[in-house]
Amino acid sequence: VETIESEGCEAVLPGLMWFVYNCLSAGDYNYKTFGTDKWSRHVKKAFRALLMQYQKPVTTALRKSTRFEVPTPITELMADAQRIVQLGNQAGEGWYLVGEMVDMIREGVPNIAVVQPFACLPNHVTGRGIFREIRRQFPQANVVSVDYDPGASQVNQLNRIKLMAATARDRNVSEERDAGQAVRPEPDEEIPTSPPTASRPDLNGKPVMELSVHL
């Protein structure tokens, strides 16, 4: 996160609670497709509903806020994931990783760093395996995989993150330039002081790039 912020970008981290929801949300699919225990799916659904009740005050407060966004419900992430993979893809973070990436791209966070430890071999497969399809469906996606293992050089890891940040900045500048050239005002029309950008402005009105880090 410090490396991303040092590059002038805003780091967007996925919520920990949604990872718990991920483990509790595929019960119906597993029962219908794999024939798992029917009582297990009911217990998981009940536990997820209980957690959502505890989380409701936080969600209500976020809806009233003008500075924070309400997290996407886990059911919508499941629908997003099924654009690319089936819910049976549960190795590593499986479909949850896909759904979260699609959701963040739609929310205006196309620059994604998939950060994973060496021990999580399933995530190496599920993460990298969907990069090509993500880029095909979302040409604006700027996705990079950063692996942490004993044999990896820290310099290489930092360089991959910095290269992604540089690409994000170049795209942001290009989008600003294209937006400024797209609308040519008439002689009597007032010229806007600043063109619209694809990035969300920070508190000082300066555009920032957002990056997502998946663990």
Residue ranges of predicted features:
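An N-terminal assembly and electron-transfer interface module characteristic of large anaerobic redox
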Residues: 1-215
